[in-house]
Amino acid sequence: MFASAGSDSLSGGAGVDIVDYSRVNADLTFSRGGIMAKSGDLGTDTISNFDIEVIKANPNRVNTIDGSTGTTASLNVNLANNLLTINNLPRIGSASITVEHFQNVRGSENADIITGSNAENDLSGGAGDDLISGLSGSDKLTGGTGNDTFSFGRGDSLLDGFDRITDLQIGADQIDGLVASNSVRNFGSVGSLSAADLSQVLNNRSFGANLAASFSLGSGSSTRTFLALNDNRAGFQANNDMMIEITGYSGNLSDLQIV
């Protein structure tokens, strides 16, 4: 069924039911109770819980899955696989919905697993001990309260599209990256984020294989802080070594756990 402007109640029946918002020129926010808010005063739909198996958003708009109003349920969201699973539902347990063309996620008050896509995602865990992974693309990652893990795989958060963790809480949060380290070496400041400037500071002698380093850019209130994780070759390699912005972190960088 094709969605439109206005506030509608949508339900399915036997078989695979699809609600298609691809023709609706609005940003969507899908939240607890099957509520689908459409930006621009286009109304709010109510989608009958779990009668609908597939929700298609407009790929040219910014669309969000919002679990922040939930009190008991937790979320498993994988935007790369277009899959939303809601856990701890009364009388049901878990239920899954295919969600296409969503870029952003706000987690619940519980322990969520949130995985982004190759787009630029804005992923927020909310309360609870969350596992958050942005995949490729320049992602904004927010853990919220709880002991959160930010997970990065090979090819994620490189120089040409690095991620930003907005609220890294050292001592509570940890980073699951290419290297395991219980210490981060401070390399001072860099003049720019060009590969050439980074290679001068993170050179073959100082930035050894499997090393974790921190450095800053700018000064005063404009100072930004970054982590660099070397994969297995000395010196900074823009196409291989991970770089993560952690401006605004709390705690002592020397205590950061990278697992």
Question: At which residue positions do the language-model features occur?
Answer:
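Acidic, glycine-rich calcium-binding repeat modules characteristic of RTX/beta-roll
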Residues: 1-74, 81-83, 94-96, 111-197
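Generic structural motif
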Residues: 30, 77, 186-189, 209-214, ...
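Right-handed beta-helix
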Residues: 32-34, 80, 85-87, 147-153, ...
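Low-complexity acidic/polar repeat-biased segments
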Residues: 47-48, 53, 63-64, 93-104, ...
